[in-house]
UniProtKB/Swiss-Prot annotation:
This is Divalent metal cation transporter MntH. The lineage of its organism: Bacteria, Bacillati, Bacillota, Clostridia, Thermoanaerobacterales. It comes from the Bacteria. Keywords: Cell membrane, Ion transport, Membrane, Symport, Transmembrane, Transmembrane helix, Transport. It is a multi-pass membrane protein. Its main location: membrane. One of its GO terms (biological process) is iron ion transmembrane transport. InterPro entries: NRAMP_fam (IPR001046). The chain crosses the membrane at residues 27-47, 51-71, 100-120, 128-148, 160-180, 201-221, 248-268, 289-309, 337-357, 358-378, 396-416. Belongs to the NRAMP family. It comes from Caldanaerobacter subterraneus subsp. tengcongensis (strain DSM 15242 / JCM 11007 / NBRC 100824 / MB4) (Thermoanaerobacter tengcongensis).
Length: 421
């Protein structure tokens, strides 16, 4: 009897080993994508949200993450099912005028993204090593290009670098959470019970949505899965999608925990002490007297890792957008130089990086429908998706997601035009 149990256990262990090996083969694309969900724009909105409104907006991060998981699965599914990325499918399906409109809006989103990510890396270098902002900006550009250049040696190499940087961000904020000692009963309550304290919170809520659900990686994810999309059989595609869903769940929930930690630490440290944070530099300086020098260093390291990794991912997404929509394939170093200009201009003019980051995230939230609607139109089209076309439930979820984003953006626009935010 014992022998049978041992044999059964061995078979289970062997099966689990095979499944784990299979999963590790597919692990990666979602972690590249997840970097965009913990970029410096998230630092800006989450720090502001926590210092101004305590734990009230954690639920926004939760539901933004649920939306992000759904959209990234849809993007990956499109890439696996069709063999094309989302911009390429748009250029195939939509009339030329619409395609150019989608391309321009996608490029604007990429510029807003690059601004946030580039500023994050620059601020990280400035805060940690006191490198002047202008020099730090150029150094950020060099590091970003070096990361993207490693793609020459295979996508797995870039995935490994990005995974390492995400691990650094995770460890830094795990340390921050440990020493901040938040009120976990409040954290739990506000994670599941929605509340918007006032009209000013609406701007931060939409900023959190824009920072957490990123349009450029909706385009990018459909490209990243192509690397492993070598067997065109139906069975292979189904297996690929199954593994990619697990990849997405692991990566995106890691991003959710990091985002929630940012807001929780801000609420537990800044709001609790009646401190309203108005700049990233102020957040860094204020942490030291409240939680110690190691806390401010952890914050700076997390910001630096976030800026470097997300800036590299932004460059990759920009290439996918330009090549897919209009067939242009400019060198990466030229692309990096072009996207450096807005960030360096803001630095040179002395504009507050925190406010620039928040505005960039709001811009991204308005771009979201331009990425979401084409994605959902294509994934529900049986002609292109065949067996992978959306089920009725997925279509309903798609309509709900698109409606939620547009209603939230419409409300913000209305309040902005009235001058109430």
């Amino acid at each position: 009897m014992e022998t049978r149990e041992i044999a059964s256990q061995r078979r289970k262990n062997l099966y689990l080993g095979i499944e784990l090996k299979k999963f590790l083969k597919y692990l990666g694309p979602a972690f590249i994508v997840s970097v965009a969900y913990v970029d410096p724009g998230n630092f800006a909105t989450n720090i502001s949200g926590g210092s101004l409104f305590d734990y009230h907006l954690i639920w926004v991060i939760l539901w933004s993450n649920v939306i992000a998981i759904f959209l990234q699965i849809q993007s990956a599914k499109l890439g696996i099912a069709t063999g094309y990325n989302l911009p390429e499918m748009c250029s195939i399906i939509f009339p030329r005028k619409w395609n150019w409109f989608l391309w321009i809006t996608a490029e604007l989103a990429a510029m807003a993204t690059d601004l946030a990510e580039f500023l994050g890396g620059t601020m990280g270098l400035y805060l940690l090593f006191h490198i002047p902002m202008t020099y730090a900006a150029f150094l950020t550009g060099v590091v970003t290009f070096a990361i993207v250049y490693m793609e020459k040696y295979g996508q797995k190499v870039v995935e490994g670098i990005i995974f390492g940087l995400v691990a650094v961000i995770s460890l830094a904020y795990a340390f921050e959470l440990f020493i901040a000692r938040p009120d976990w009963s409040k954290v739990l309550y506000h994670t599941f019970i929605p509340s918007i304290p006032n009209k000013d919170a609406m701007l931060i809520a939409v900023g959190i949505l824009g920072a957490t659900v990123m349009p450029h990686v909706i385009y990018l994810h459909s490209q990243l899965v192509q690397y492993r999309n070598k067997d065109g059989s139906l069975q292979a595609k189904k297996e690929h999608l199954k593994m990619e869903k697990i990849d997405i769940l692991v990566a995106m929930n890691t991003a959710f925990i990091i985002n929630a930690a940012m807001l929780i630490v801000s609420a537990a440290v800044f709001y609790k002490n009646g401190i309203v944070i108005e700049s990233i530099e102020e957040a860094h300086k204020t942490l030291e007297p409240l939680l110690g020098v190691f806390s401010s260093w952890a914050f700076g390291i997390a910001l630096l890792a976030s800026g470097f990794s997300s800036s590299a991912v932004g460059t990759m997404a920009g290439q996918t957008i330009m090549k897919g929509f209009v067939g242009l394939n400019i060198p990466l170093n030229v692309r990096r130089l072009v996207t450096m200009v807005p960030a360096i201009t803001i630095i040179a003019l002395g504009i507050d990086p925190l406010k620039s980051l928040i505005v960039s995230q709001v811009v991204l939230s308005f771009e979201l429908p331009m990425a979401i609607i084409p994605l959902l139109l294509i994934t529900s089209n049986k002609k292109f998706m065949k067996e992978f076309a959306d089920t009725p439930l997925e279509r309903i979820m798609g309509v709900l997601v698109a409606s939620f984003v547009m209603i939230l953006n419409g409300l913000l626009l209305y309040l902005t035009l009235k001058g109430e935010v």
